[in-house]
């Protein structure tokens, strides 16, 4: 479905600055389109090395971080391979593991009633699951999609030290949080960090992601990556986005402020529980009203959120992307009327 207020895919509501887009177009126009892009995008790799503080030979770029995830799992997962994840989490991990013949080892996330309520990683249970299953791969999304939960670097390091199995930290939303696992790469050759340009960097439409790891791991993952996987338009746009880091960082600060404003407002809305988040989205739990009815009622008011009721432990939840102030206000208004339409008395908080 489409709606004027589209807050269902965790996109950045603000585009790359116009001047940066024009620089990209000029650069692309100067190249012959009949030629392949660079097999090794050195300009982008060097820009990413400066941006991340990690060596260029330890960076692999992909057509979105989804491609990097797929290539990584192709060289690490086969029939019967165990992969540990905490759930609920990004569904692509399980999808790719299943396609490759692997087996998921699922560890339920914990939950704190708050206030504010939040989902929590249970690191002890993850460690127990790794040891019991002898899983060679553990994947952690931090901040986690769809719960917004972060895993502290000390906990990541604990996972890395517990055997030589691969620890994969998906940091697609790391710009919205305080923590990153990248400084641990130097000490832990079994650590892999994944990132994307689709969220904070405003390039969802151009599909650019990257993987940070030891050069040895990168060389192995490259064997599963298709050649010429990133067109030169996307390469140029990614470099331009990195050159606009100050403007994009300012947008991140605005989104974080909006996230906290909206979560505070939701604390006064009866019938819903909002979960704290370190990302550019958050979960709301419909305590009395049917969440699917609430979703449909908001869509009738041209506000599109994400129905995540099929996820484990989220049977009554919707996921909401933080948008502009106007979009967020439209969401708050639509939610109030949607709760009423879904059969709930907002004034009393009872069905």
Predicted regions mapped to residue ranges:
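N-terminal small-domain helix-loop-helix segment of the aminotransferase-like
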Residues: 1-64, 71, 351
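PLP-dependent aminotransferase class I/II
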Residues: 15-17, 190-268, 273-275
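Short acidic capping loops at alpha-helix termini that bridge into adjacent secondary structure
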Residues: 55-59, 79-82, 171, 189-190, ...
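Conserved PLP-anchoring active-site segment centered on the Schiff-base-forming lysine
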Residues: 75-96
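Active-site phosphate-binding strand-loop segment of PLP-dependent enzymes
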Residues: 105, 110-175
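Conserved PLP-binding catalytic core of the aspartate aminotransferase-like
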Residues: 255-256, 260, 266-301, 318, ...
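PLP-dependent enzyme catalytic core of the Aspartate aminotransferase-like
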Residues: 297-301, 310-351
């Amino acid at each position: 479905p489409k709606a004027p207020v589209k807050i269902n895919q965790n996109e950045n509501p603000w585009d790359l600055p116009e001047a940066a887009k024009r620089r990209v177009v000029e650069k692309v126009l100067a190249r012959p389109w009949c030629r392949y892009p660079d097999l090794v995008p050195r300009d982008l790799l060097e820009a990413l090395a400066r941006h991340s503080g990690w060596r260029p030979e330890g960076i692999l770029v992909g057509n979105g971080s989804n491609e990097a995830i797929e290539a990584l799992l192709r060289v690490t997962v086969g029939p019967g391979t165990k992969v540990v994840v905490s759930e609920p989490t990004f569904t692509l991990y399980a999808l790719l593991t299943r396609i490759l013949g692997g087996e998921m080892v699922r560890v339920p996330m914990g939950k704190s009633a708050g206030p504010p309520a939040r989902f929590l990683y249970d690191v002890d249970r993850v460690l127990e699951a790794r040891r019991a299953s002898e899983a060679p791969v553990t994947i952690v999304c931090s901040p986690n999609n769809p719960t917004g939960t972060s895993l502290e670097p000390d906990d990541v390091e604990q996972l890395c030290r517990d055997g030589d199995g691969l620890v994969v930290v998906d940091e697609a939303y790391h710009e919205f949080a305080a923590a990153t696992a990248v400084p641990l790469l130097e000490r832990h050759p079994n650590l892999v960090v994944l990132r994307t340009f689709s969220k904070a960097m405003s390039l969802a439409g151009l599909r650019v992601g990257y993987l940070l790891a030891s050069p040895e791991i990168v060389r192995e993952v490259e064997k599963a990556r298709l050649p010429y996987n990133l067109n030169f338009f996307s390469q140029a746009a990614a470099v331009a986005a990195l050159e606009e880091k100050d403007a994009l960082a300012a947008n991140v600060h605005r989104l974080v402020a909006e996230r906290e404003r909206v979560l505070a407002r939701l604390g006064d809305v009866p019938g819903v529980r909002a979960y704290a988040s370190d990302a550019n989205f958050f979960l709301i739990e419909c305590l009395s009203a049917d969440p699917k009815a609430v979703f449909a009622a908001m869509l009738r008011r041209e506000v599109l959120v994400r129905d995540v009721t099929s996820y484990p432990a989220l049977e009554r939840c919707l996921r909401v992307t933080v948008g502009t102030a106007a979009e967020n206000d439209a969401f708050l208004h639509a939610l109030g009327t949607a709760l009423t339409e879904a059969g709930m008395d907002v004034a009393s908080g009872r069905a």
